[in-house]
């Protein structure tokens, strides 16, 4: 067991999906995995291991924000030996061409957080996805006919930002969306030499406010990113 995860050694697969919402983890386990067994209920951050198309895969919630995903991702990597981690979550569009329910694959993540600068105050350390996972996810999504955007995202420490207009300005520089976890996940992956990718469904738009989704939709639908994430985890080189 680790401090925040109750699993015993061997109960977590070396490939894992990481939704922020623990109820989304439960949904994925119940609807996509066979013979799913719950390995964690600590703080109601549900985690499950089962099989997907014959491959052993885990799924676990991470909560909201970079501090939270940093705790769970680090323990999964260091204490349980996870090698491939794919975040599946929601994001807000910063770009006129990126619409609600479409997918964004984060090739890199800018951030306004100090979580990385605390380690590297003299550098702007780049947070980038595993190219292997990114390449596989892109081709899988396209083959499945899903509208998919690849580009940079903003990982923000603040949901209710006082810099709303500056965030929107990033969209004009090609940043596709804003979310709250990818940069920290990519940083941990670089530190520990594992593979990570963030796949997001656009749940709302900062540039087209009339585009929106409900909390129930965000929890129980958005299945395209789940399919792409699972297919990417089991794809052979």
Curated annotation (Swiss-Prot):
User: What residues sit in the active site?
Assistant: 204
Q: Which GO terms describe its cellular component?
A: cytosol
Q: Which residues bind phosphate?
A: 20, 24, 43, 87-90
Binding-site residues, a purine D-ribonucleoside: 4, 179-181, 203-204
The UniProt record lists the keyword Nucleotidyltransferase: no
Q: Where is this site: Important for catalytic activity?
A: 218
Q: Which UniProt keywords apply?
A: Glycosyltransferase, Transferase
Q: Name one GO biological process term.
A: purine nucleoside catabolic process
Give the EC number(s) under which this enzyme is classified: 2.4.2.1
Q: List the disulfide bonds.
A: none
SUPFAM superfamilies in UniProt: Purine and uridine phosphorylases
The record describes the protein's role as: Catalyzes the reversible phosphorolytic breakdown of the N-glycosidic bond in the beta-(deoxy)ribonucleoside molecules, with the formation of the corresponding free purine bases and pentose-1-phosphate.
Protein name listed in UniProt:
Purine nucleoside phosphorylase DeoD-type
Q: Which organism is it from?
A: Streptococcus gordonii (strain Challis / ATCC 35105 / BCRC 15272 / CH1 / DL1 / V288)
């Amino acid at each position: 067991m680790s401090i925040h995860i109750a699993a015993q050694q061997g109960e977590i697969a070396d490939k894992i999906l990481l939704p922020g919402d623990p109820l989304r983890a439960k949904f994925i386990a119940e609807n996509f995995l066979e013979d799913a067994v719950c390995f964690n209920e600590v703080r109601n951050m549900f985690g499950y291991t089962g099989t997907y198309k014959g491959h052993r895969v885990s799924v676990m919630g991470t909560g909201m924000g970079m501090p939270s995903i940093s705790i769970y991702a680090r323990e999964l990597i260091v204490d349980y030996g996870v090698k491939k981690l794919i975040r599946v979550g929601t994001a807000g569009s910063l770009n006129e061409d990126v619409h609600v329910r479409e997918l964004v694959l984060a090739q890199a993540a800018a951030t306004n957080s100090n979580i990385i600068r605390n380690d590297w105050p003299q550098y702007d350390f780049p947070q980038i996805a595993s190219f292997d996972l990114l390449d596989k996810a892109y081709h899988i999504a396209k083959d499945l006919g899903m509208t998919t955007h690849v580009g940079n995202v903003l990982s923000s420490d603040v949901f209710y930002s006082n810099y709303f207009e500056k965030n929107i300005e990033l969209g004009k520089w090609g940043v596709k969306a804003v979310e709250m976890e990818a940069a920290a996940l990519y940083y941990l992956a670089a530190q520990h030499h594992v593979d990570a990718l963030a796949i997001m469904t656009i749940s709302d738009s900062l540039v087209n406010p009339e585009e929106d989704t409900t909390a129930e939709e965000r929890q129980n639908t958005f299945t395209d990113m789940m399919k792409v994430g699972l297919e990417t985890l089991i794809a052979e080189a």
